[in-house]
Amino acid sequence: MMPAQALCPQPGEKVLDLCAAPGGKTTALGCRMQNKGLIVANDISPKRVKALVKNVELMGLTNTFIVNESPERLRQIYPEFFDRILLDVPCSGEGMFRKDREAAQSWSRYKSDECAAIQREIVKSAYEMLKPGGTMVYSTCTFNPRENEENIEFFIKNYELMIDKLEPIGGFEPSRSEWTQSKDPTLSGGLRLWPHKAEGEGHFVCRLIKKGNKKDNEEIGPELRYTSKEAEQAAQAFFEFAGENMNTVVQGIFHLKGSSLFKLPHYLNEVPHIKWEKAGLYLGEYKKGRFEPSQSLVMALKKEDFKRIIRFEKNDHNIIRYLKGETLFNDGENGFAAVCYEDFPLGWVKQDGQMLKNMYPKSWRMM
């Protein structure tokens, strides 16, 4: 996760992961930010964005706005908005040949010159979304200088960008300024990972700073607000559910998309008119006046946040039965409860007598 480490986001910042799926980098950013601030995680592929949603939910992130748009569309919505932007751009994939035979077979279809042109368009959009004084990390999984050092040379020549040198760690080596036309020594400020010299595949990472003075983000205090009358009705049903089943209070700006209720993340006061999958914390479904909690909600909470928990110890066979979606049995009070592996929530059950209705998502279940 060197790209996320190089970006070094701080709690409370506005961060964009522009090519985010399947989500490993986004979750690494989220852990560093401690669910404070905003991560806009985008992927242009509708299929890949589904995996992004699942991984964000598995990690219990609540500050993430997951979108499915082109960079060109996003730059219209977010001019000079972000403190930091991560660009793990599509590339020719030469660094993955050893690991992924399909990458080698498809190499002839993804010519390096074509990839470099796409990468430059992505950076153009990202540059317009980055605040003056903001940080951008550019990374690929290819060896080709055309997509790496030569692109960085183009960026610092054509934009108000400068290289912020990365120190080699963990088997990384300095990037190769001698492979560029200008031979500018600052172009050795990026990093390369060679698979024959270190554990891992081939990667390139470079950190860039946009020239100018950085403005601090505006302070936003806690508030309770609804984006529509329907959202307020759904939120009231959620508050009733929380009063009966939870020990914690969730406040913020509530938004209803269809029957799905969300608590919006920090800095997102309303949902812009773009294609999106998840906005902050997905609380659950509101249908026919009733609220049913989501898997996302249980993953975002701690065991002490629930009024009822069903705790399984290590090696208890009921853990596997739960993850397979099987019905469990237990003596206890009727209502919703969190199933926990020791102290870690796994998902919901709904107790009715001795029977526990398994609410673990079907798409997550073990086969």
Identify what each model region corresponds to.
Residues 6, 22-35:
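Conserved SAM-binding loop of SAM-dependent methyltransferases across substrates and taxa
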Residues 12-21, 40:
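Conserved class I S-adenosyl-L-methionine
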Residues 47, 83-124, 141-148, 175-177:
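Mobile active-site "lid"/loop adjacent to the S-adenosyl-L-methionine
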Residues 13-14, 38, 65, 84, ...:
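Short glycine-centered segments of the SAM/dcSAM-binding site in methyltransferase folds
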Residues 42-80:
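S-adenosyl-L-methionine
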Residues 82, 135-138, 143-262:
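Class I S-adenosyl-L-methionine
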Residues 33-34, 130-132:
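Helix-to-beta-strand junctions that scaffold the AdoMet/dcAdoMet cofactor pocket
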Residues 201-204, 211-367:
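Polybasic, low-complexity RNA-engagement segments
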